[in-house]
């Protein structure tokens, strides 16, 4: 790592409601930026698009999404942030994640749901705040 924090904001086409295709696509984009970035930020609900079909599109923490992100972070030696539709204890959340190459994991459930898109009718609001310091990921090892 360098003394400067190198961030890649990845905004690209999301294949609607196709987790497997999106994971493959974004995995390839992360491979391309590896070695040139410390933190890759993926789009909101990057695995499915901003779907309201939460029962069909949600993934659990043990499902396909989180283990794949952990693998990317370790393999490409970069932190990865973004969000996905999560199912947890029978509820659905727009869950943000921040996973480091060293395996540190942080999660935040969106608290202020977008009423105009009826997000509040399909998702549960989070009840905790999360504040992270990014200083440690830019420090030389």
What residue spans do the PLM features occupy?
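Short, flexible loop segments at the rims of nucleotide/cofactor-binding pockets, characterized by
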Residues: 17-20, 56-61, 116-122, 138
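Short, flexible turn/loop "capping" segments at secondary-structure junctions
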Residues: 2-3, 49
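Cys-nucleophile CN-hydrolase/nitrilase-fold catalytic domain and related Cys-dependent amidase chemistry
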Residues: 19, 27-101, 106-107
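Active-site metal-binding loops of divalent metal-dependent hydrolases
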Residues: 12, 45, 111
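Active-site catalytic loop in hydrolytic enzyme cores
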Residues: 87-138
């Amino acid at each position: 790592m360098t003394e400067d924090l190198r961030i890649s904001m990845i905004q690209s086409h999301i294949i609607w409601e196709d987790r497997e295709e999106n994971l493959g696509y974004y995995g390839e984009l992360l491979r391309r930026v590896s070695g040139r970035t410390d933190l890759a930020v993926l789009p909101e609900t990057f695995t499915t698009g901003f779907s309201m079909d939460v029962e069909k599109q949600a993934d659990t923490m043990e499902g396909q999404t989180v283990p794949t992100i952990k693998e990317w972070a370790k393999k490409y030696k970069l932190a990865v942030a973004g969000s996905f539709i999560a199912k947890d204890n029978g509820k659905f959340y727009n869950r943000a994640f921040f996973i480091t190459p060293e395996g540190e994991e942080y999660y935040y459930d969106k608290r202020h749901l977008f009423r105009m898109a009826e997000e509040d009718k399909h998702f549960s609001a989070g009840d905790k705040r999360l504040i992270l310091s990014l200083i440690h990921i830019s420090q030389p090892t």
